[in-house]
Structures are given as structure tokens and as C-alpha cells.
Amino acid sequence: MVQSDTSKSPPIAAVAQESQMELLESAAPAGALGAQSYGKGARRKNRFKGSDDSTSSDTTSNSFVRQGSADSYTSRPSDSDVSLEEDREAVRREAERQAQAQLEKAKTKPVAFAVRTNVRYSAAQEDDVPVPGMAISFEAKDFLHVKEKFNNDWWIGRLVKEGCEIGFIPSPVKLENMRLQHEQRAKQGKFYSSKSGGNSSSSLGDIVPSSRKSTPPSSAIDIDATGLDAEENDIPANHRSPKPSANSVTSPHSKEKRMPFFKKTEHTPPYDVVPSMRPVVLVGPSLKGYEVTDMMQKALFDFLKHRFEGRISITRVTADISLAKRSVLNNPSKHAIIERSNTRSSLAEVQSEIERIFELARTLQLVVLDADTINHPAQLSKTSLAPIIVYVKISSPKVLQRLIKSRGKSQAKHLNVQMVAADKLAQCPPQESFDVILDENQLEDACEHLADYLEAYWKATHPPSSNLPNPLLSRTLATSTLPLSPTLASNSQGSQGDQRTDRSAPRSASQAEEEPCLEPVKKSQHRSSSATHQNHRSGTGRGLSRQETFDSETQESRDSAYVEPKEDYSHEHVDRYVPHREHNHREESHSSNGHRHREPRHRTRDMGRDQDHNECSKQRSRHKSKDRYCDKEGEVISKRRSEAGEWNRDVYIRQ
């Protein structure tokens, strides 16, 4: 009985248990009935021990302990295992050191290209980053500057935000693998409870959710996909909520039938390649080609040219870049349709303009597009330009109407067309369609608002760690700043000299009344400024070659930039601008190389403008500042004269 009790007792060391058993045997009663049940044979069997000094009962009861003690030898890593682990650690540390060194070198390298993200990524759960803690997290619609490729899974770059440093960016291959893993876990989660399924999807949802969940339908990113997604998301919701349970059987089937149609939206590429510097495009307050819109944008162009001198490229774009949609350029079957349409811009010309814009952006200078055909943000939403849309807004339609009427009968004739265009812009969702909305009452306030945004964007794209000059920019600067270069002397210096002589007579007669103000200009004057901007911007060697192509154009091809039909406004443009441009060019002599010049102003126009200004100024309330965009007479702009620094004249004669 004693031995049976000891066999049930907690296991102890073999030697200690043997001594305790001998003591207990001597103290136990001799005739115990419980001990009889085992018999002497059993007791003898238990007492005779094996070679390890343990009885059979000890072996069964102490098997766990004894095996653990034996495992104290077998669980120890051998010398080969230790050396292998040390080798792995050394290799890991060396790879991490090399990755850190490559990361430091990449800080001074130029930006290879830029991408816009279509997905969201969180680096919190990543454990395979080349340098732990150096992965970059981003949201959908963010912009990334990529310096170089590290390996197949990681790029080296930075998030285009102020204060963000260089790090590791997951490559499209890695994001695609993560998306597949996420889908597999989501499918597995369907077989578990809703709680576990929700946890699995949410943990990976922070890393790479589908772009449609974080992409507003009206945003500028891949409208084709998001439009379909909005339709897909709305229809199942309507099937689920209002339908009774009896129809719940049919709604999944209808959804499954629709899924192949929407299958392409689930494979949206994680990145879209965009220009390294997002081009700035002005829209509003109404249609380009009319005086109210042109004079307001002209004032902003002049301000930007002086405010960001040496850091900005202002270029004119005559081609209809709204045709440069990704779905069109990537689908050869649609090329013939575009070519057969009555558009003045061929796809080859459009593609050339897009490449030129990308090339300008490589210098990491601010790029401003003076685009003739862009009057609405939706025109560029499907392109790869990812522009900064600046909306020059007149909040009150009555004020815009009075401004249009103040420009004379020729502008009031097309009042309805301009008001409809302004109304279309006002209906756009502001946060999703525009990056900057200039609705200030004062010209200087609007200019400072735009300047503050562009300064912040400049700091975001030029971190302190990459202050070294851009090699491409340095090369183009060295080319464009040689005043005695024969090419530049013929293209810019000589033409500017001709412009000075051509303008001397008309300017001397009206300089006293014109110089104290920023006179509103017509379309041809506005475009001449942009062409001169392109010729004199720093760091745009590609732009000079493009200017030469502009110079080779005939007058008819240039005029086509302004008489291009914009939807249903074609007859208004032809009626208004063909005689206008012919009249101005008859009064102006052209230089030998074909540069467009600034047309002389008409005094009769100015006198009528004085009267219109007096009437208009009485009717305006809080929108007094719009005078600074248009009727710049007398004291309205004279106090800005010292700050403006003769913008009009400097734009054309400054070398």
C-alpha cells in the first residue's frame, strides 16, 4: 500500500525517491491489505531497478522529468547550430549596414521619377524592411519621389511632404503580393466567425486596402475605375438594405454576375507615374479666351514670374492635353477614333507635350502651364499630369456679370457662355476638384495665398537633406545663362531687342497713363507673356527647343489656339478673337525670328474702360478687389507700384 501511494505521489529525483522509499518501508505496517494486492512479485519487480537506478513505477511516473533532464543535453544547440546562427546574424547585420549606407547615399541623388499612390500602406507591421523602422507609410493620393531601386521588393525614396525624410518604399511587386495575401486571408476569414474575419481583414486593411475604399469617386485619380466602383458599391447596398429577406437569395447571384464586369477595378495599379513636380494649371473664373478670365490669370502669371524668379518655369501649351488620357494612350484601338475626330491636336502632338512637361518637371522647378484648352478640372483628371488646379473664383455671379459687361459690347455679347462656364466651375466639389481656391477680394491677398501654397509645396519637394543642386538643373542653367551664346543671342537677345524698338514709339506716347497700373491685356498679349516666360525661365533647356517650334508656326496655326471650339462655344470664339488678333497684328511689326510681341494698347478702349470702371465700382460691395484684376486705374494700383516693380515691362524686356 505504501508503494502504491508513492507511485501516485508527485515525481521527484530518482535517488531521493529511493531513500524515501526505504524509510517508508521500514515504518510501514507489515500486514497491510493494500500491499497484499500487489504481491511480493510485484513489490520485488518494483524494487529491482534498472540500470538508471529507477523502478518501473518510477519510470512511468517520472518519465516527464527524466526526459526533461535528458533534454537538457539534447535541447542545447550544437556548435554547428551556434555557428550557423551567428553567421546568419552577421549576414543580417552586414546587409542592414549596406542598406543604411545606400540610404545615406541616395539622399544626395536626384529624383528619378515620381508616383501617385492609389493604395494606402502602413509600415507598422513590416518586419522585412532592409533597415528596421525606415519604411515609409502613405495614404492613397499621396505623392512619392523615388530616388532609386533597392531590390525587387523595395525602392528608396521619400513622401512628398514637408519634414519627411528618405526611406524605403514598397515596390509594386511587393504591394501586389501583399494584396494577394490579403485576399487569401479574407477568403479564409469567411469560414470563421464574423469577429475573427473582421480582425483579419482590418489588420491587413491598414496595409493595403483596395483603392476604391479610400478614393473618392470625384477625385482626379483614375476616374474610370472609381466611377465603376461607385456604381458597384451603390448597387449591392440597395439590394441589401431595402430588400426583404426573401430576396436575399437572389441578390448574391446578381452580384456575382456583376463581379466579372468590375473585376478590373480590383487590380488597379498601386502607383501612377506622374511628373516630379506637379504642374500648376489655372482655371476660372470663366472661359479662357475672354478678357475677364485672361486678365485675371495674366496678373497671377506676372506675380508668380517675379515671386519665384529662378525657381519657376511658365510654359505655354497649345495642344489639347485633355486628350492625354491614360485609357486613350494605352489603348491603340482608340487612337484611330481620336485621329478621325475634328480635334486640332493629334495624339503625337499631345504625347509630345506631355513628354515636354515631364521633362520640365525633372528639373524640380515649379512648372506653370498656360494651357489654352483647359477650363475645367475634369479635363485633366484622367491624365497622368496630376496637376495643381488653381481656381480663380468670383463668388458672386452678379459681380462676374458686371465685370464682363464692363469690358465692352464685344465681351457682353458672349455673356451667357461665360456665365455657364463659371457656373460649371462653381458646381465642382471644392476639396476634390481644386487644390487652391483664390476667392479673395484683393489681388495682393490672392497672390499671397497662391504664393504660400507654392512655397509650402517647394519645401515639400526640396527637403534640407537634398540641398545639393540638381545636375539636370545645373546643366540647363549653365546653358540658359550664357548671354553671348550665338543660339541664345539669336533666339532671345535679338528678339528682345526688336521688341524694345517695336514698342518704343507706342509706349512713349502712353507711358504716363499706362505705367502706374497693370493694364488689362487681351488674349494675344497674355500669350505673348507666356511665350516670353518660356524663353527666359531658368533651367528649361527643353523649353527653348520647344519655343523654336513655336517660332516656326504660322500665324494661322497660332490663331487656331484661340479659335479652337470649346464644346458649344466655337462660334463665339471665332467671332471675337479672329478680328481681334488680326487687328493687333496689323499694328505691330514682327521680329525676324517670328516671336510674338506685346500689342500696343488702344486709347479709345482705355477711355471706354474709364467710364465702365466708374459705373462698375459703384455697384460692387465686398468684391471691390476685382478691380485689381481688371480695371487697374488711378489709385487702385498705384500703391502697389513700388512692390510690383513694373511687372508689365519687366516681363517682356528683362533678360
Swiss-Prot record:
Biased composition (Low complexity): 193-205
Superkingdom of this protein's organism: Eukaryota
Cellular location(s): Cell membrane, Sarcolemma
Domain SH3: 110-179
Bias kind Basic residues: ranges: 593-604
Molecular function via GO: actin filament binding; calcium channel regulator activity; high voltage-gated calcium channel activity; identical protein binding; phosphoprotein binding; protein domain specific binding; protein kinase binding; voltage-gated calcium channel activity
Keywords annotated in UniProt: Calcium, Calcium channel, Calcium transport, Cell membrane, Ion channel, Ion transport, Membrane, Phosphoprotein, SH3 domain, Transport, Voltage-gated channel
Stretches for region Disordered: 34-107, 186-257, 483-632
Residue numbers of Phosphothreonine PTMs: 549
Recorded topology in the membrane: Peripheral membrane protein
Function as written in the Swiss-Prot or TrEMBL entry: Beta subunit of voltage-dependent calcium channels which contributes to the function of the calcium channel by increasing peak calcium current. Plays a role in shifting voltage dependencies of activation and inactivation of the channel. May modulate G protein inhibition. May contribute to beta-adrenergic augmentation of Ca(2+) influx in cardiomyocytes, thereby regulating increases in heart rate and contractile force. Involved in membrane targeting of the alpha-1 subunit CACNA1C.
PANTHER family from the UniProt entry: VOLTAGE-DEPENDENT CALCIUM CHANNEL BETA SUBUNIT
Stated name of the protein: Voltage-dependent L-type calcium channel subunit beta-2
Gene: Cacnb2
